[in-house]
Amino acid sequence: MKKYLLIYALLTTCLSAWCQPKDYEWNTPSKNSSESMPCGGGDVGMNVWMEDGDILFYLSRSGSFDENNTLLKAGRFRISLSPNMDMNYFRQILHLNEGYVELTDGVISIQFWADVEKPVVHVDMTTKREALNIAVTYENWRTRDITMTKREAFQSSYKFSAPKGLLTHHDSIVAADRVLTFMHCNGEKTIFDATVTQQKMDAVKEKLHNPLKDLVFGGRMKGDGFVLMDEVTGRYASSDYKGWMYVTERPRKNANLQITLANRQGNVDAWSAQLSSVERTVRHDYDRRNTRRWWQRFWKRSYLESTGDAEQLTRNYTLFRYMLACNAKGQWPTKFNGGLFTFDPEYVNQEEEYQLSPDFRNWGGGVHTAQNQRLVYWPMLKNGDFDLLRPQLDFYLNIYKNAEERSRLYWGHEGACLTEQIENYGLPCYPEYGTKRPTGFDPGMERNAWLEYEWDTCLEFCMMALEAHRYNGMDISAYIPMIRSCLRFFDEHYQYLANQRGAKKLDGNGKLVLYPGSGGETFKGAYNSTSTIAALRSVTQALIDYENGTGRNNQADVDYLRGLLTRLPDITIRHGMIQPAILWERVQNTEPTQLYPVFPWRMYGVGRPDIDIARNTYLNDSLAVKFRSHVGWKQDVIWAACLGLTDEAEALITKKMADGPYRFPAFWGPGFDWSPDHNWGGSGMIGMQEMLLQETGSKIYIFPAWPRKWDVRFKLCASRGTTVEAEMKDGHVVNVKVIPQERQQDVVLP
């Protein structure tokens, strides 16, 4: 690559015009919920669609975990209009720039939006001509206790080890004349208690963070001029439901439906008080203006837009980013396996019939599989969506002390042992821990062929926090004890294991012996796993840099970290390629973790030393080639982009970010997980970002793996509060703008 003189004049106007995202729309009704359109904000998501003359929407909120750790929907809502829309002029529009969905025929307009500052959903209904008779029905399929089938239990944290007779407990619904209240009330005993007992942690149970006990969640529906008319029953997809129909007392030209949500641990009275408190803060017109301004500001942080062959790819990138932003204020992270936008499971995969409820998602609701979750959150750095990172970082902040209790109880040392399949209370997932365990088996270990000794994915979230500080100075002081604890676990635990085997805690070179270890779920029984070494080296050095850079460092902490660096072994290179480890016992899955030093750990890449070793690994390692794919969480496009392999990156991103199989093009899946597959979209976002912008040291590489034949404009973020806007047209870089201006000298063009 060569560095050219950049032309910066007259760039602001021509680049900024691309900040506003285009609306996405269709002009015919849908067949079923799989043809729904996402809508949301704050921590609320809706699937909105019109079917057989009715407008329907599912409503979901992050954190709505029941006793079994299923992430339950709030319900389904059905709106019927008389007179109805003229289907000849029907349009359903996602107004991206202002964050709302509209259904209209040019006369009638129904607008859905979620307040970004509080958990309130509004449906604004207007007509320019004849007044409307409006019926709104709340539909619920959990009006009685339901015994889960074996397959259905996969929506919970019991998954394949569900006890016989496991129930999804009923909701409580109170239909008053003008207001409907719905709630789910967890009892004192939940899967948390079963997990603690299973994992022999009753001795420290009272110390443990327990987010499920006495959790009450749900909401209240009301609308001016709506009164209760009838109770109805029916069946949608595979689920029977009961509904409560509210109708307008008289025809109206304007109507508003408001649904207020609340989640609270305690009792119903406390929950009801919180709900009422939120309702009192609602100021409809002000809240709508504030919400739309929030979305407008959001889109100005960054953008990607293309014409021609890549237009579909950048459009889907933008649509998926909208879905992620719907949980910007969430107390809980966006789940990789559907997020807030799952739909009826029988429409997910035509090859497998799922006669299950709308609450179903494969791989659980409260268990957060770290290898998958990380791909949802890495793209937020270059997007400049640092606030969206908080729910995921706070997830680990809230649970790491439970993981420290594991280490103390089982092994008598310090450090947070955070497993791969981890619950929202910081313990290993109940079935993955293993229900059939040999006598005397270490109670701290999972009895699972895929997950044993896989502890290093927590370090990626540690790095996200450190990178967020490096990018925009985000205050991460609350996360620093957690990061230290994660590092300390590896140092102390592998010395502990070595001491169990013999008299020495370190090898003959004074290095940790990382055995037994794991390279993802793939290289099991690994000796000095490359992915673990790369993670420990990168996070340790980044934490030292943070401590020194902020001036708040404790010298003893820095000295410890420097000592840890000296104890970390080197990654293994053989035959000119990065190896997954020195040795491993077996290959269990299809993750080529020998490429993790490229991403996420950025030890190799454009502008970095020894890139040929990493390229050789990508192109010639037999397992890396065998495992290559664009599906689901596969990361090959990221590695290709990071290594400047433009042709490879183009081929993979064309498949990865193509339209998904459902009507809304950013609903990918099910892949290896569920639909909409968020780690499919996340890995695609990362790949596109790396094709457009990479940073090595102080240098900013623009278009390092972007095909010259694809016209594109982008704005992305880099470290030190930097934003880069650039355009490629007809194979040439024609516009570049860097803020702050002093970083213009750091830009390297293709």
Feature roles, as predicted:
Residues 4-13:
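Sec-dependent N-terminal signal peptides
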Residues 20-435, 533, 555-623, 719-723, ...:
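Aromatic-residue-lined binding/catalytic grooves and analogous aromatic/hydrophobic interfacial grooves
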Residues 15-19:
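Sec/Tat signal peptide C-region and signal peptidase I cleavage site
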Residues 463-496, 557-585, 604-724, 728-729:
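Non-catalytic carbohydrate-binding regions of carbohydrate-active enzymes
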Residues 314-315, 367-372, 384, 452-460, ...:
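Aromatic- and histidine-enriched alpha-helix N-cap/loop-to-helix transition segments
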Residues 281-318, 325-341, 387-394, 398, ...:
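Acidic/polar-rich alpha-helix caps and helix-coil junctions
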Residues 300, 323-327, 375-387, 460-473, ...:
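Well-ordered alpha-helical scaffold segments within catalytic/enzyme domains
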Residues 341-366, 418-480, 491-562, 734:
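The feature captures the catalytic groove of carbohydrate-active enzymes
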